[in-house]
């Protein structure tokens, strides 16, 4: 169940009232140029994150003004399964930065609870807990829809498969590549066209121009509320065993298997088990938390694997051949569901 709405601080000054020992820092895993601060409030360590379209590629290409993260937090969506997932956000304020389009998040400092950065394999026990808690979080919001009138107005359904589409890349090129990842993606997509099987390259190219057929096919399967960026560098564990999830930048309605496919694509070098075993564990988690996966699972999983290629085929093309081949085969098999 969802909780009551959280209140916004009237201003950044109010949000950070009483803050001491304010120290700017760089996020070591940051793909954006967003600013961060370490602060102490009542002797407790916190982190402040400043969000604005000027400093974040994903916010720019999806038109995220005043922060979807803040809107989801205010609506109580991040608190859907507090016994399983800790989001660490304790306060927020909007109206920050140019045109008042930005927002500021105040979070508990959970850095000591996060998984270490790098390519070290996630411990099996923690990975099992992560998959179960992620499935439980999806189950807690099963059937949720983002109302087009009453909101909260989060990431539009189809937008999460357009991060690295042609229009997004062209927009970043026109701005002079303010961030490195979109420029790297352009190089990766050129490579994808050279090394991917012709039928897969053609399918992905079409969807990079217009993701509508993929999104419409996904919409015919169940939806829930998505974190949208579940990966090892956004994950940790509290002392009482709950999963910490930070960086709720891509929140919105979508298929649960998106979370799984994203994890498989980004964390492939850190998985303690095969992709297939990870898929089975996530499905079992959904069932354990009360979701009947019969009738829709194969379709949604297959489409989300194709969606991951539309999102990250460029990255796979810059990596090893076996990994690329696995994803290209998954994409080929998915085309039957479109």
Predicted regions and their residues:
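Active-site activation/catalytic loop segments of kinase-like enzymes and analogous catalytic loops
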Residues: 71, 75, 253-290, 305-334
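Regulatory N- and C-terminal appendages and interdomain linkers associated
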Residues: 1-30, 120, 142-152, 200-205, ...
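Catalytic activation segment of kinase domains across protein kinase-like and atypical kinase folds
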Residues: 233-263
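Short small-residue beta-strand/loop micro-motif enriched in glycine and branched aliphatics
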Residues: 56-58, 114-118, 245
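Conserved NTP-binding catalytic cores of kinases and kinase-like/nucleotidyltransferase enzymes
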Residues: 1-101, 105, 208, 214-218, ...
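Conserved structural core of kinase catalytic domains
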Residues: 93-129
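Hydrophobic HxD+1 residue recognition
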Residues: 230
């Amino acid at each position: 169940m969802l909780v009551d709405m959280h209140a916004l601080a009237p201003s950044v000054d109010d949000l950070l009232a009483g803050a001491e020992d304010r120290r700017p820092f760089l996020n070591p895993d940051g793909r954006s140029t967003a600013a961060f601060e370490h602060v102490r409030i009542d002797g407790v360590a916190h982190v402040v994150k400043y969000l604005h379209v000027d400093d974040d590629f994903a916010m720019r290409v999806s038109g995220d003004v005043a922060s979807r993260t803040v809107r989801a937090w205010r609506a109580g969506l991040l608190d859907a399964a507090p016994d399983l997932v800790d989001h660490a956000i304790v306060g927020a304020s909007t109206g920050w930065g140019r045109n008042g389009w930005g927002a500021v998040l105040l979070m508990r400092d959970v850095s000591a609870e996060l998984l270490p950065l790098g390519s070290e394999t996630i411990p099996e026990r923690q990975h099992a807990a992560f998959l179960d808690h992620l499935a439980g979080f999806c189950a807690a919001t099963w059937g949720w829809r983002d109302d087009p009138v009453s909101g909260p107005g989060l990431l539009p359904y189809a937008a999460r498969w357009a991060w690295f589409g042609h229009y997004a890349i062209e927009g970043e090129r026109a701005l002079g590549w303010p961030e490195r990842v979109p420029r790297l993606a352009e190089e990766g997509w050129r490579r994808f066209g050279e090394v991917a099987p012709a039928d897969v390259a053609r399918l992905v190219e079409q969807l990079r121009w217009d993701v509508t057929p993929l999104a419409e096919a996904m919409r015919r399967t169940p939806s829930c509320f998505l974190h949208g960026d579940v990966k090892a560098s956004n994950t940790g564990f509290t002392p009482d065993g709950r999963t910490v999830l930070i960086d709720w930048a891509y929140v919105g309605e979508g298929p649960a298997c998106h979370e799984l496919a994203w994890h498989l694509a980004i964390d492939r070098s850190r998985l303690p088990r095969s992709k297939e075993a990870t898929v089975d564990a996530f499905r079992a988690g959904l069932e354990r938390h009360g979701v009947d996966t019969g009738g829709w699972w194969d379709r949604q999983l297959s489409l989300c694997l194709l969606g991951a290629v539309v999102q990250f085929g460029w990255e796979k093309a810059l990596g090893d051949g076996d990994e690329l081949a696995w994803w290209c085969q998954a994409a080929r098999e998915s085309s039957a569901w479109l």
